[in-house]
């Protein structure tokens, strides 16, 4: 609006005939009374409006105070104006309408609309004065708007920023669009009918120009709701699960076209636009009651666009306040990778945050430590911090509640924090420690209620040198064994102590030699009420502490409102005494601190503060007792963040860690078998377990009492070696990967601690002791594992109990020793492929390799087979950078080609088992592959082998389609359809492969085509009586599709036979079938071929001979092309057979022993005829397998030989599993014994 218009506007308003005469002025009062376009608000005091001549643009004079007060504060009913309009509202409401403020009574500054439309079309008013938004952000409520906006430098014209548009008044109405705009709420199912509806938030009607650009709309949206990250709109008549995203000019034009079409059709409905922030999505996740059912939960997750547990959902934009003073509040946020992690191991010097575009330096020490195994937590536990804290416990809080703390490797840590808070931890390796359980990054920390922002001080050591939580804090060791205690006043130091300054405390921090963390402190941000000591700033949602190998123990406190009765009672009489101040169980931790494996499942609480405790109680054991007492089974710690009480209770049934709280039991303490902490370790004195690194531990070792669980493991498999054999921490980390990738061998990362060998075998090395070395990169699609984990971490499996430990099985309830490095479950947006019926293929998964040397090897159309020594020449070496995902904060660049094992034969009678529960998530991850647009191009690529390929296709038989006859369909899926047919009179299985398997960019098409022909060529060379024969390829199928022709097995899959009531298989036949399968797998492994999907569905049988059934291995080839189309179906149908090392991310390499694990489950299937874990959700299955707390229940009628073989096959440690050669030999012996036993009674009857 230029100056001339201002002058014209106010000159007209001051003319004598302004009130009663009809003059051609743009701001003539609206005769309809619907809205006033007059510049001056009407008089509401009932008196005649006098012409005001004391305001002028030229003179700068202002209106009188009475004039403004009468028009701002609605006191009386409006009276007719001079023109006889009886419909005027009060001056307050008039002003609200003029400046575009909604009538909803919102106090949000962003309610101020940028446009206001006069319904009668007499004027087109636009706000152009930027000061309105500037002042608007400072408003607390609408009533103060005029006062805030009327500064001494503002004229009335400038105040509202209107321009004269009378010349185009008629066109201005049609050039505007009114749409509903909702923000601040979330989409949730309505209780009862589960119909989705938008809950909470605000809804306004906004007006935008039809020619508005996307950038202008974005600016307007940010003025309305500055936290907006996602814009979607809803077409009238559509449900909330059909929202349309707007992210570009084209999307905006489409939305406006939809508006035009709707306007042409008539009706009163309006387009509705939704503005979502990241915190909105996360709040929706927290608000979902998982008890309502998995499918409903998945649905809500998908509709809200939530990436469960993902750091992508965490943002600084979700903060209630983003001021620099609330630094701790910002500390736990992560804005799309801006939040960097301090630590040399990831190449970052300090923890820094970006707050609304301004860089802030974290005042907190950024430390990171992976969970350590049970044999090594003396490295990380403060030596004399615990007992001194216990001595200072006030009498009012003398109860000690054991928290089921098992040795460190049994502890689980929350994988995700809260919506909008995701402090990410690098994969730092502490000397002699590594992850045995838990996902990188692990979240430990001090959980503070959202909105209430309580302060929880930490108490680092015994010398009364305490630090508030916002300062550079000491860590609570992950392996610390603590009991709970409450009752300290919030915000104050431990009784009898005086806080120490941040700088002084920082000087006392001792960090291990290989983890130099830079500390950056901002004391000015910390104020302690009532004293001059520093205290933490306000914390939103969660205060997270990285835990490096620091030698102090931090103890948080909870407010007095935390009820002591919510804590589990102690069952160990020793727990209720303070006589043993030197033991770790005397350490006290209170508050919402889900540390050291504490499961904070608060099911009933009248307080918003949730004390951290576990459903399962453990009696902590120290080595002063010759025979350790029994500890509970496994204790997992999942993050529970109390927000509002209802959301807290809803949250309790969920875990943000697929490895945590999946199987928390509420039973009395029981034995826990652990692989690494052998019986010898329990009885050893703590001097054997002390750390030699005195620089990292300034306390004396004599104060340490190491706590171990009782181990129920057989002596021959679990032998232990004292940890003092490893002296130099660097010796334990020699496999460290540059740039913070998978650091390998901590002392606790032991696959075997074998006393006979007198050295430590690292996990990476131990897991690769098979004949074949497979790079998982070649088998799993990138987001196959990561997405099922992101779904599984939210599953409600608290009612699932671990497989009972009956003392006979080594593999029951043993801890898994693989590192839970989830760095490769990071950037999931590239391929978006999910495996079904997974012949697990992952050429594009880019799982981090363990090579230190850089470089990328070119990706081949088909990966080369491995040599017999199991060493691939094409290992990928992805370089890792800090990422955004909570799963490990590492995003991988494109890796090179990967070495793999040539896959073999594809089963032709595939049994299609579509998983409905997985479909909702998958469909929101990617759209199903559509049919190729250019069918000629696609057909040419698919039907012809690639030129210049390294494979020789001359030996591959090409079968003409006209020679085939399809008889009946056996099954179908996203991969294709299988038919029973005839090939020149012989029974065959024909698998028609969909063209969508080869869809994609030209380079992708070429790669997939090469993979198909390369695998087909290999399959044609596999010949064994217990392997399904591969006959050839059909390249001239209908529409140019490809097909494979394989041997047909009359009775189909073994699973089908087992469930048939008319088929009875005695023990001898079952042994024969198992033996045949073992022979077939032995042959495949001899050809460097790993199946990856061995199960009864993929074992084909022929039972025509009643005395000798025949079993053949199938469905293990052509796996790569499945990756593009295998969605939603096979995850649930394949997980029970997957080995832990395939799921836990411990290494990018696995051995052929993954098939041995699957075979153990197959033996159980053959024995029972049932499907493993039939009634369990796949999330529970994942957690159980990875934690090694879940195996099929062995029936009582199982004989010892079969039981032992099964348990050895599904042992957690790949090295402990037998080879198929050994398995086949043992089954042969068992079969011979069964045959002789069966023949003896027959001979006896014949002699009679």
Curated annotation (Swiss-Prot):
Residues 31-47, 475-486, 659-676 have a biased composition (Polar residues). Its EC number is 2.7.11.1. Residues 1-49, 475-540, 555-585, 601-635, 659-684, 845-866 are annotated as: Disordered. Residues 176-278 form the PB1 domain. ATP binds at residues 970-978, 991, 995. One of its GO terms (biological process) is response to auxin. Belongs to the protein kinase superfamily. Ser/Thr protein kinase family. This is RAF-like serine/threonine-protein kinase 20.
């Amino acid at each position: 609006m230029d100056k001339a218009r201002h002058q014209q506007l106010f000159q007209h308003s001051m003319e004598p005939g302004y009130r009663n005469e009809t003059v051609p002025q743009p701001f003539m009062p609206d005769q309809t009374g619907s809205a006033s376009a007059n510049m001056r608000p009407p008089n509401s005091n009932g008196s005649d409006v006098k012409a005001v001549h004391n305001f002028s643009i030229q003179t700068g004079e202002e209106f009188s105070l009475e004039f403004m007060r009468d028009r701002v504060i609605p006191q009386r009913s409006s009276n007719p104006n001079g023109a006889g309009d009886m419909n005027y509202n009060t001056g307050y409401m008039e002003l609200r309408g003029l400046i575009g403020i909604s009538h909803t009574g919102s106090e949000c500054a962003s309610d101020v609309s940028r446009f206001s439309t006069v319904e009668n079309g007499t004027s087109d008013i636009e706000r152009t004065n930027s000061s309105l938004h500037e002042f608007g952000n400072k408003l607390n409520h609408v009533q103060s708007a005029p006062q805030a906006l009327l500064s001494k430098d503002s004229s009335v014209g400038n105040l509202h920023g209107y321009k004269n548009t009378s010349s185009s008044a008629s066109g201005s109405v049609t050039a505007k669009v009114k749409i509903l705009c909702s923000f601040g709420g979330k989409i949730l199912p309505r209780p009862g009918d589960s119909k989705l509806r938008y809950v909470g938030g605000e809804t306004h009607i906004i007006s935008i120009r039809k020619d508005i650009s996307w950038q202008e709309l974005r600016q307007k949206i940010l003025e309305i709701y500055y936290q907006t990250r996602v814009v979607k709109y809803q077409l009238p008549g559509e449900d909330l699960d059909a929202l349309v995203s707007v992210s570009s000019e084209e999307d905006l034009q489409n939305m406006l076209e939809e508006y035009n079409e709707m306007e042409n059709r008539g009706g009163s409905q309006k387009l509705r636009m939704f503005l979502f922030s990241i915190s909105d999505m996360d709040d929706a996740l927290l608000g979902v009651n998982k008890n309502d059912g998995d499918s409903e939960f998945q649905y809500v997750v998908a509709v809200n666009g939530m990436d469960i547990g993902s750091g992508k959902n965490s943002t600084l934009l979700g903060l209630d306040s983003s001021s620099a003073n609330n630094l701790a509040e910002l500390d736990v946020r992560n804005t799309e990778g801006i939040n960097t992690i301090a630590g040399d191991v990831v190449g970052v010097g300090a923890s820094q945050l970006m707050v609304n575009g301004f860089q802030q330096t974290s005042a907190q020490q950024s430390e990171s430590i992976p969970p350590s195994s049970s044999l090594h937590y003396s490295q990380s536990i403060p030596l004399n911090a615990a007992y001194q804290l216990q001595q200072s416990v006030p009498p009012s809080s003398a109860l000690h509640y054991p928290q089921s703390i098992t040795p460190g490797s049994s502890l689980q840590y929350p994988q995700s924090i809260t919506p909008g808070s995701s402090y990410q931890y690098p994969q730092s390796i502490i000397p002699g420690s590594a992850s045995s359980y838990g996902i990188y990054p692990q979240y430990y920390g001090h959980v503070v209620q959202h909105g209430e922002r309580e302060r929880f001080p930490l108490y680092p050591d015994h010398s009364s040198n305490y630090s508030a939580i916002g300062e550079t804090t000491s860590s609570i060791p992950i392996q610390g064994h603590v009991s709970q205690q409450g009752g300290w006043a919030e915000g104050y130091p431990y009784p009898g102590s005086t806080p120490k300054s941040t700088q002084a405390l920082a000087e006392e921090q001792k960090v291990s030699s290989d983890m130099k963390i830079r500390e950056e402190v901002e004391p000015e941000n910390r104020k302690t009420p009532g004293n001059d000591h520093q205290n933490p700033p306000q914390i939103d949602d969660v205060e997270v502490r990285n835990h490096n190998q620091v030698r102090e123990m931090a103890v948080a406190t909870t407010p007095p409102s935390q009820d002591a009765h919510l804590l589990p009672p102690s069952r160990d009489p020793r727990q209720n005494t303070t006589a043993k101040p030197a033991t770790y169980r005397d350490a006290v931790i209170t508050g919402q601190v889900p540390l050291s494996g504490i499961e904070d499942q608060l099911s009933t609480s009248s307080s918003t503060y949730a004390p951290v405790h576990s459903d399962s109680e453990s009696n902590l054991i120290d080595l002063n007792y010759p025979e350790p007492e029994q500890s509970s089974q496994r204790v997992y710690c999942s993050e529970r963040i109390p927000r509002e009480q209802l959301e807290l209770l809803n949250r309790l049934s969920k875990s943000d860690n697929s490895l945590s709280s999946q199987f928390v039991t509420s039973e009395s303490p029981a034995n826990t078998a652990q692989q690494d902490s052998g019986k010898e370790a329990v009885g050893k004195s703590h001097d054997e377990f002390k750390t030699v690194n005195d620089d990292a531990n300034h306390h004396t070792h004599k104060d340490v009492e190491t706590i171990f669980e009782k181990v129920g493991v057989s002596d021959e498999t679990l032998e232990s070696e004292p940890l003092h054999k490893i002296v130099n921490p660097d010796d334990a980390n020699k496999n460290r990967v540059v740039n913070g990738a998978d650091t390998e061998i901590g002392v606790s990362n032991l696959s075997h601690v074998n006393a006979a060998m007198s050295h430590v075998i690292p996990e990476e090395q131990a897991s690769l002791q098979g004949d074949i070395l497979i790079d998982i990169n070649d088998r799993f699609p990138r987001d196959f594992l990561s997405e099922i984990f992101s779904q599984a971490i939210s599953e409600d499996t608290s009612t699932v109990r671990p497989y009972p430990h009956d003392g006979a099985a080594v593999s029951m309830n043993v801890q898994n020793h693989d590192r839970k490095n989830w760095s490769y479950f990071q950037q999931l947006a590239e391929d978006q492929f999910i495996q079904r019926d997974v012949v697990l293929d992952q050429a594009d998964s880019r799982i981090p390799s363990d090579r230190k040397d850089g470089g990328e090897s070119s990706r081949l159309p088909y990966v080369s087979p491995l040599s017999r020594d199991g060493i691939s020449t094409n290992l990928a070496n992805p370089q890792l950078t800090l990422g955004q995902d909570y799963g490990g904060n590492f995003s991988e660049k494109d890796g090179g080609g990967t070495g793999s094992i040539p896959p073999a034969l594809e089963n032709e009678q595939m049994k299609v088992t579509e998983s409905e529960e997985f479909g909702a998530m998958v469909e929101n991850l990617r759209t199903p592959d559509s049919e190729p647009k250019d069918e000629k191009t696609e057909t040419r690529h698919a039907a012809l082998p690639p030129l210049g390929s390294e494979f020789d296709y001359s030996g591959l038989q090409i079968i003409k389609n006209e020679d085939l006859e399809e008889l009946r369909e056996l099954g179908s899926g996203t991969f294709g359809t299988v038919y029973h047919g005839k090939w020149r009179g012989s029974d065959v299985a024909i698998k028609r492969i969909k063209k969508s398997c080869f869809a994609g960019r030209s380079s992708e098409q070429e790669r997939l085509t090469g993979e198909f022909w390369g695998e087909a060529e290999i399959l044609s060379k596999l010949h064994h009586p217990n392997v399904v024969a591969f006959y050839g390829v059909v390249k001239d199928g209908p529409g140019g599709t490809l097909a494979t022709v394989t041997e047909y097995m009359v009775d189909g899959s073994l699973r089908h036979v087992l469930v048939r009531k008319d088929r009875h298989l005695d023990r001898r036949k079952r042994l024969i079938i198992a033996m045949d399968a073992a022979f077939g797998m032995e042959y495949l492994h001899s050809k460097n071929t790993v199946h990856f999907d061995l199960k009864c569905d993929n074992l084909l049988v022929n039972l025509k001979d009643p005395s000798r059934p025949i079993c053949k291995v199938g469905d293990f080839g052509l796996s790569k092309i499945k990756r593009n189309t295998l969605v939603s179906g096979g995850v649930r149908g394949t997980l029970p057979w997957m080995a832990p090392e395939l799921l836990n991310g411990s290494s990018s390499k696995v051995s052929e022993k993954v098939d041995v694990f699957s075979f153990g489950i197959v033996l159980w299937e053959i024995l029972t005829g049932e499907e493993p874990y039939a009634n369990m959700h796949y999330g529970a299955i994942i957690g159980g397998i990875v934690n090694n707390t879940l195996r099929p229940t062995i029936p009582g009628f199982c004989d010892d030989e079969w039981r032992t073989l099964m348990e050895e096959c599904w042992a957690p440690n790949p090295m402990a599993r037998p080879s198929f050669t050994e398995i086949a030999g043992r089954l042969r012996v068992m079969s011979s014994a069964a045959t002789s036993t069966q023949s003896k009674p027959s001979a006896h009857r014949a002699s009679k």
